[in-house]
Amino acid sequence: MRILLANKFYYSRGGDCIYTMNLEKLLKAKGHEVAVYAMQYPENEQSEWSCYWPANMTGLRAVVRPFGVRQVVRGFSRLIDDFRPDVVHLNNIHSQLSPVIAEIAHSKGVRVVWTLHDSKLVCPCYTCSRKIGGKLTWCTECFTDKTAVIRHRCLHGSLPGSVIGYLEARKWNRERLERCTDVFLPPSQFMKDTCVAGGYTAEKFSVLCNFIDVAKIPPFEDMPKGDYCVYLGRVNEVKGVPTLCKAAARLGKRLIVIGGGEMLPQLKQEYAGCADIEFLGQMNWDDFMPIVRKARFMVLPAEWSENNPLTVIESQSLGTPVLGARIGGIPELIEEGVTGMTFTSGDVDDLAAKISAMWNYSFDYRAIAMNAVEQYSSEAYYDKLMRYYRGED
């Protein structure tokens, strides 16, 4: 098949980018012809298709791009005509590319498949959350009142930005997006339920969990686990890292924090005198994989509704159980007492109690690894995805 993948960026910026680039490799390995559509950006990897991509979104472009500007329409239409895809597979496209590319593909008779990495279809600020009384809280006001984004200034506290978010949501409404999309693929039941609660038609959605490249997972080896737990991800408030550090410091249990983020300097300073907490900063897979592999467990203390976090899948594939916050799509990935445990998101007391419970719990690490590799392998994912590409959903 000829498959066109679309995503805002084309480098390892976040989960959506990593997914798109891994999918490109998988499809090419299976013998498909693959083209890519993204936005020009200094950190992008090289691509033979970049001549079709729109310019980086700065200045005035940031205001008009979300509504489908001429440069996007021209470039994407030309790519469709030149490449002649059988399927266009969309990922994160709002704002920088805009859903106009879905309409273009649909108008040219191309099947449109859309993987949903966030809640943008029903929430202008992507997360269905906002701060109330200083605490990040689940919010669905926009499901029934699109002006809520303006009233609460949900986009970075900016009135102009929130107005743009409102206008974007009005233009790319449910009816319009359902009309030009053949199937939406949320990676979690949670994301499907969120979109349906926001007014979308359930029959347009099919849950397809993310995958891992099992080639990068070393064969399981029985080895003693280290005397530490690990956090892997962005170091910020919504990821729950401050709450995790409080719990670890209280217990005197060793915690290794891997990742960069806006709160890293602050937390390093705050816990400089705590020998039990170690901050390693940003690391690549080859460097952090052995650390996660030997950890007693990985902690995902999210305080916002994560969709289908890859860190859970990767950790379990390495034979490392996961202690995850009971929020968003995280509980779907954890079998209580078998592949990990869950705790009440944002509750430092419950988190501390579950860290203690996990520390002394006997897990079958081999079974965790074997089951995860089988369940989340690229082969299993590919077989399911091809059915959606062929319209057999």
Regions found by a protein language model. Give the residues of each.
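Short hydrophobic beta-strand element within catalytic cores of glycosyltransferases
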Residues: 321-324
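Carbohydrate-associated surface elements
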Residues: 190, 211
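A charged, aromatic-enriched C-terminal amphipathic alpha-helix characteristic of glycosyltransferases
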Residues: 360-390
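Nucleotide-activated donor-binding/catalytic signature segment of Leloir-type glycosyltransferases, i.e.
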Residues: 266-290
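Short acidic/histidine- and often glycine-rich active-site loop of Leloir-type glycosyltransferases
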Residues: 312, 327-337, 341-342
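Membrane-proximal helix-turn-helix segments that form the acceptor-binding/catalytic region
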Residues: 107, 120, 131-184, 193
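Conserved acidic donor-binding segment of nucleotide-sugar-dependent glycosyltransferases
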Residues: 336-337, 341-348, 355-362
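A conserved mid-protein helix/loop that constitutes part of the nucleotide-sugar donor-binding site
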Residues: 18, 230-250, 262-265
